[in-house]
Amino acid sequence: MKTFLPCLFFLLILVGCAQRPTPPATKTADWAAHQQQLNDLTDWSLRGKIAIITPENRHSLNIYWQQSGDNFHITLTSFLGSTILDVKKTALSTRIIDDQGKIYFGKNTQTLMTRLSGIELPVEVLQQWIKGNPIGAVYQLNENNQLVSLTGQDNKNENWSANYQDYKTVQEISLPHQLKLTRQDLLIKFAIQKWLLEKTEIF
């Protein structure tokens, strides 16, 4: 009995150590490593669906987004496949083709998109936010070190909030597949069907 009690005490200590929660420092390191993956992810594309909802209107569209460094190409189409807006942004300028085939050029992508289509999309900050990278924002993580929500500003200093509902692993990187973006009475829902993580020649 005298031998049994010390052994039992030793086993209880081992069990307690095994069940000890992950130290905050380790979780911080895990998030830092994941965010570095997202920072390094500069060439990618996605396709999915987007719903833009206001008290007056609701638009349901397909979205195709190709990103190469700081340049991007976004195409919004109807469910029947007709182009609503085609946006190409480079370091020099933004070129937009509307649903009538007319071509426009400008410097501020977000402002030009809104003026031509009425669609308010914070594309400059969304380049990072859509990957789950909260650059320039206040954010919260879940127990898996995935972004749950963020609050930040676009390049017009307007406040936006984002909530992330679903993640899937794509080539060993955890990426969002559903998110909601809100600004006052504007709600934008993304349902991402596919991510492609490779360089594409789009410019």
From Swiss-Prot:
Lipidation (S-diacylglycerol cysteine): C17
Lipidated residues (N-palmitoyl cysteine): C17
Signal peptide: 1-16
PROSITE patterns: PROKAR_LIPOPROTEIN (PS51257)
HAMAP family, per database record: LolB (MF_00233)
Family classification: Belongs to the LolB family.
The protein's name: Outer-membrane lipoprotein LolB
Lineage, uppermost ranks: Bacteria, Pseudomonadati, Pseudomonadota, Gammaproteobacteria, Alteromonadales
